[in-house]
Amino acid sequence: MRNESPSGSDLSPGRDLCLNFYLLVSICLLVSVCLLVSGCASTVPGRKYMARYERALGLYQEKKYEETLKELKPLLIHFPVWAEGSLLYARAARATETIEGRRQASKILVRLMSNYPDRADIRHELASLYFEQRFFTYARNQYETLLRANEKDSESHYMLGLILQRDWKRYGSKKDLSRMITEFASTVETDTLNREAFSRLAAAYLEKERPDSMLLVLNRFLRSYPSDLDAVMLGAIAYHEQGKYEQSSKEWDRFFSLCDAATQGVFNDISLLITPQRRKKFKRLDKAAKEQFVRTFWKGLDPTPTTELNERILEHWRRVGISKVLFTVDASGTPGWRTGPGEALIRYGFPKNREFSFTLEETAALSLPTLIWHYSDEEGPFEVAFVDYALSGEFQYFEFTRLPTAFDRKTYYSPTSYEHNYGAQVFHNLFANAGFLRDSGVREELYVGIPLENVTKGDWGKVPFEAVIFDSLWNELSRVSTTLDGARTYAEPDVGGILIRELSFGLAPGRYVVALAVKDTVSGTLGLTKANVTVRALSRDRLSVSDIELAYLMPEKRVETKIGKDKGILPNPSGTYVVPKPLRLYYEVYNLARGRDGRYRFVTKYSILPIKSAGGTFWGFVASLFSGQHYIVNSFERQVESPSSAERLSIDISALRDGSYNLILEVEDSVSKQRVTAERAFEKVSVPSASGGASTRGHP
C-alpha cells in the first residue's frame, strides 16, 4: 500500500513559492530590457532605419509623396516621437493635398509639439497647415507664439500680415489695417528679398491713403528688382494718388513695355464701360475699326482734351491695377478684375461707404459673408452687393432676383462714373458759335464767356487761353494757343460781369468737337469747355442764311457795311436774356435774286416757341403753343442794294414767361420765292425782385 501525503501534492509549499518568485523576476527583467531597448531606439534609430529615412527624403525631394509615406511608415511605428522622421512624414502627408493627408499631418504635428514645444520648425509647419486649412485663429496664435520667441522671424511676420489682411478685407477694422502694415514692414526689414511682402505693404499703404510711404517702399524695392511688374504698376498708382498724372503716365508706359500682350489686353479692355448694345457692335468690328473705336471712346471721356494727357484712361488703368492687388483670390487664383468687387471698382471707382456682414452662430440667423458698397451720383444713391458663396474669399454679385436691380440699371444706362481731380477750382465757360459765308468758305466764329468772378482782374494778356478743334473721330484739326488779350467785358447788375473772347476758324461743313481751356495762374482757377459743333453748308448758288448770333449789344442805328466787317456786336455766349433787355441777334442773308428794278427784296418771318422741358407733358406743351404769352410771330420785308445783307434785329420778349425758347427765322426771296430757315435756342428770365429774391436765370 502506497503512503499519501496529507496535502495531496507532490511538491512542498516552499519550493512552489520559490518558482513563482523567479518567474515574476524574469518577466520584470524582460519588460525592463524591452522598454530600455525601445526607448533607445525611439530616440536614436539604427543604421537600417536611417538608410530608410535617407531614401524617404530623396523621394520627398522628387515629389513622390505616396512612396515617401510608404518608406517612412515603419519609422513612424517604431520611432513615433523621433522629430525628423515624424516631421518629414507630416510634410509628405500634407503634400498629397488630400483631406486624409492633412488630417494625418495635423495629428502628427500636434503630437510633436507636445514633445518639442521649443522647436520653431515644427511650430511653423503646424501654423502653415492651420493657415492652409483656413483655421486662421489657430494659425494666428501659433505665429504670435513664434514672434514672442523671435521678433525677427520674417516668415511669421509675413503670415500674420496675411491673416490680418484677410480680416481687414472682411471687417474693415482700421486697427487690423495698421497692424497689417506693421507686420509687412517688419517682414521687409528682415527679408529684403520677399517680393510679395513689398507688394502687399505697398498695397496696404494704398488702402491707408499714404502714397508717399507707398513710393518709399516701392523705390527701395525697385532698386533690387527694377523690372518687377507689380512694383512698377503700384508706382504708377501711387503717383496718380498724388495727382502727379504725367509721372504716373510715364510709369504706365514702363509697365506696358514690360508686360505681355495678354496683360495689356486686360488693362485696355473697355467692355465693362460700355453698354451691352455698344459691346455687341464692338465685337463685330475688324481690328482697325476696334482700335479706332477705343481711341474715340477714350478721347470722348478725356477731362482735359486740350492737353496730350488723358487722365481718364490713367484712372481706368489705376482701377484695374487696384482690383488686381486688392481682390485677387490667392486660393483659386481668380484675378481681381474678374471678381464682383473688382468689376464694380472698374465701373464706378471706390464706394462712399462699405458694409460687411457674416454670421454662422447657432443663436443667430445664418448669413454668408456679404459686402455691400454704397454709391451716390447725380442720378441718386445706389448700392451693389457681393456674397462669398463658397466661403473661399471670392466675392461675386448677389443675384437674388431676375428683376433689374439698381446695379443693372446703372450697367445698362450709365456705365461709367468718374470725377476728375483737376487740382484747381474748375468752372465752365459759357460757349456759343455761329457760321458765316466768306470768300474762303464757311467761317465758324466761337464765342467764349468767362465769368469775371472766376478770374483775377488784371492784364488779360497774361491769362493763357487754349482752343482745339477736333473732327468727329477726335483727330486734331486746329489748335490756337493764345491769351485773353482783346477780350471784351459786359456787366449789368442782374447779369454779373462776363469776359467775352472771340475766335474764328475756317471749317468745311460737318460735325466737330471744340475744346477750350482758360487757366488763371494767379487764382489757380481753370475754365473748361467741351462742345459739339455742327457747321452748316452755306450755298453760293442759291438763297441761304447764316447761323444766328445772339448778342448783348448792337449799334442802335443800322450801318450799311460789307458783310462780316465791323459788326460792332458784342456776342452773348450764355444765350440768356434778363428782361427788360430785348433779345438781340445778328444774321446774314446770301444770294438774293435781283428784281427788275435792280434791287433785292426779301421777307423775314420770325417765330418764338417754347422748348418742351424734359419733365413736362405732351399736352402741356401743346397747350403752351396756344398761350398768348408763350409764343411770338412777326414778319417784315427788307429791300437792299446787294445780293447779300447783314441783318440786326431786336425783339421785345417781356411778354414771354420765364423759360427756354427756340427762335426760328424764315427768309423768303421776294423775287425767286426761295425759302431758308435758321434756328437758335435762348432762355428768358425775370429781373430779381426788390425784396432780394434770387434770380432764376441760368445758362442752358
Regions found by a protein language model. Give the residues of each.
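Intrinsically disordered, low-complexity terminal regions enriched in Ser/Thr/Pro/Gly
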Residues: 399-700
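Structural signature of tandem alpha-helical TPR/SEL1-like repeats
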Residues: 62-70, 95-111, 133-145, 168-186, ...
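Canonical tetratricopeptide repeat
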Residues: 88-91, 125, 159, 200, ...
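Helix-start (N-cap) detector for alpha-helical repeat units in TPR-like alpha-solenoids
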Residues: 48-50, 83-84, 120-121, 154-155, ...
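Residues within mature, well-folded domains
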Residues: 134, 166-167, 206-211, 222-459, ...
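N-terminal leader/linker segments that initiate helical-solenoid repeat arrays
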Residues: 40-91, 95, 99, 103
